[in-house]
């Protein structure tokens, strides 16, 4: 199947075919030289034997009249164990300066979600080692988790910490998909993983900020295809990290405008919910294995009612909200214990003791926030003895929700900590019972277990 380029407008390329037309989402190739090709993806049929395509690479070097070859299938990317430890682009080509991935297995990036009868149903908790997450908004194996936050509140650091903890403590395979984020962060992540020894359990796929919108839109599907093969072909439990899902929506919005579709609310594409559904419905557990996905969600201007974060919300099992106020107070990870939620925080899943401890922590923090206005106007002395005790313990709880990160060791000089869930529950239970009312507040800041806080208090 051969055609000719008839128009190029930025990343949009119109191609005419003399006989049959390629299918929607099929890949087309343009040869620039013996070694160089450009890949296009069919977006719509225009009539008169013409198709409109989106280029997945820069359109430099393309010209009208060039020959286009139909591949008769969607983009296919390499899958399997050979992609572990590698850094790939949207087309599955290496970005790490090494040779092509040596595998015979290739899979198309466009496919249907698993059949209903193939889905897995049991609910099991994924231990992250991060106290505030494990206590307040526990993650489900095979669930979808959103990290919500504005610019610079620590979404990427939290994702890197999660990759580190899962690789070190669960031995699982991770697929990291960088969608429209900074090239520098991808470079740092690659070298950090190499240094910490978790790279050989991870596949990295990047379509960064400098790439055309076609690459940024499709790179999430490339990462997902790699994860699906590990789940179904290798029968593994996989972690899929997407940083940032908002950039996926943003790329879809750019392409929608380039294709001349009428925008909907706030300039987003009219197909926003459909595009998100196609991606999210493929991220699930089957009877063969599970994909647990952790997605960073940039919230434009910290506005949670924006259509992009609002659309993502409807697909999630747990939400981890990052708070700018907590970063200003020096509490890291800056996760808001009152704004974060999880479907798993029920007695039937986590057990009665865990549930009661988490709810009591939230109740005390909620009361503390209500009292802050009174304290600001009248001072601590005007509070009742009960309320003074709430403030006293809530401050210790708020500090104890922080901890040092392994991936931030070289910045902070402090050793990172992985805290098992049972230790997390014990620590918060003891604070709630008043066993550590005599320790100073600072002793609870950026420590791991309650024993670390007691040891720190002795040094103060």
Curated annotation (Swiss-Prot):
InterPro entries: AAA+_ATPase, ATP-synt_VA_C, ATP_synth_F1_bsu, ATPase_a/bsu_AS, ATPase_alpha/beta_chains, ATPase_F1/V1/A1_a/bsu_N, ATPase_F1/V1/A1_a/bsu_N_sf, ATPase_F1/V1/A1_a/bsu_nucl-bd. Its EC number is 7.1.2.2. It holds the Pfam family ATP-synt_ab. Keywords: ATP synthesis, ATP-binding, Cell membrane, CF(1), Hydrogen ion transport, Ion transport, Membrane, Nucleotide-binding, Translocase, Transport. GO terms for cellular component: plasma membrane; proton-transporting ATP synthase complex. The keyword Nucleotide-binding applies. ATP binds at residues 149-156. It is found in: Cell membrane. Its main location: membrane. The keyword Repressor does not apply. It catalyses: ATP + H2O + 4 H(+)(in) = ADP + phosphate + 5 H(+)(out). One of its GO terms (molecular function) is ATP binding. It is a peripheral membrane protein. CDD domains: ATP-synt_F1_beta_C (cd18110), ATP-synt_F1_beta_N (cd18115), F1-ATPase_beta_CD (cd01133). It is an enzyme of class 7 (translocase). NCBIfam families: atpD. Produces ATP from ADP in the presence of a proton gradient across the membrane. The catalytic sites are hosted primarily by the beta subunits. Belongs to the ATPase alpha/beta chains family. F-type ATPases have 2 components, CF(1) - the catalytic core - and CF(0) - the membrane proton channel. CF(1) has five subunits: alpha(3), beta(3), gamma(1), delta(1), epsilon(1). CF(0) has three main subunits: a(1), b(2) and c(9-12). The alpha and beta chains form an alternating ring which encloses part of the gamma chain. CF(1) is attached to CF(0) by a central stalk formed by the gamma and epsilon chains, while a peripheral stalk is formed by the delta and b chains. PANTHER family: ATP SYNTHASE, ATP SYNTHASE SUBUNIT BETA, MITOCHONDRIAL. This is ATP synthase subunit beta. It comes from Acholeplasma laidlawii (strain PG-8A). The gene is atpD.
């Amino acid at each position: 199947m051969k055609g000719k380029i008839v128009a190029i407008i930025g990343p949009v390329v119109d191609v005419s075919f003399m006989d049959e037309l390629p299918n929607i989402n099929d890949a087309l190739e343009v040869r620039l030289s013996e070694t160089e090709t450009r890949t296009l993806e069919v977006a719509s049929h225009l009539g008169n034997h013409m198709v409109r395509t989106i280029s997945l690479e820069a359109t430099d070097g393309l010209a009208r009249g060039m020959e286009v070859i139909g591949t008769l299938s969607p983009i296919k990317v390499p899958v399997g164990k050979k992609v572990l430890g590698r850094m790939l682009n949207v087309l599955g080509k290496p970005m790490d300066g090494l040779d092509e991935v040596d595998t015979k297995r290739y899979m198309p990036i466009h496919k249907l979600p698993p059949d209903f009868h193939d889905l897995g149903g049991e609910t099991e908790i994924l231990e992250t080692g991060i106290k505030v997450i494990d206590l307040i908004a526990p993650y489900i194996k095979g669930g979808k988790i959103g990290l919500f936050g504005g610019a610079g509140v620590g979404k990427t650091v939290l994702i890197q910490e999660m990759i580190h903890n899962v690789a070190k403590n669960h031995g699982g395979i991770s697929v990291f998909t960088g969608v429209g984020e900074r090239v520098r962060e991808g470079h740092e992540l690659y070298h950090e993983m190499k240094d910490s020894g978790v790279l050989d359990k991870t596949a990295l796929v990047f379509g960064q900020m400098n790439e055309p919108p076609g690459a940024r839109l499709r790179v999430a599907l490339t990462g997902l295809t790699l994860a699906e093969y590990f789940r179904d072909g290798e029968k593994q439990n996989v972690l899929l990290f997407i940083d940032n899902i908002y950039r996926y929506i943003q790329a879809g919005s750019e392409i929608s405008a380039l294709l001349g579709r009428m925008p909907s609310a706030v300039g987003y594409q009219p197909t926003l919910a459909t595009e998100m559904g196609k991606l999210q419905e493929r991220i699930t557990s089957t009877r063969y294995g599970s994909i647990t996905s952790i997605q960073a969600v940039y919230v434009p201007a910290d506005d949670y009612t924006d259509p992009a974060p609002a659309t993502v919300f409807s697909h999630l099992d747990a939400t981890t909200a990052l708070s700018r106020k907590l970063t200003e107070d020096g509490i890291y990870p800056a996760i808001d214990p009152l704004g974060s939620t999880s479907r798993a925080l029920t007695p039937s899943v986590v057990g009665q003791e865990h549930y009661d401890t988490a709810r009591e922590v939230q109740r005390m923090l909620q009361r503390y926030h209500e009292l802050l206005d009174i304290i600001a106007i009248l001072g601590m002395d005007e509070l009742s003895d009960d309320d003074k005790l709430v403030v006293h313990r809530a401050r210790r709880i708020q500090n104890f929700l922080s901890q040092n990160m392994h991936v931030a060791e070289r910045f902070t000089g402090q050793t990172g900590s992985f805290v098992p869930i049972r230790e997390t529950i014990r620590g918060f239970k003891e604070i709630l019972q008043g066993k550590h009312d005599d320790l100073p507040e600072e002793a609870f800041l950026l420590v791991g277990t309650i024993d670390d806080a007691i040891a720190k208090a002795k040094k103060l």
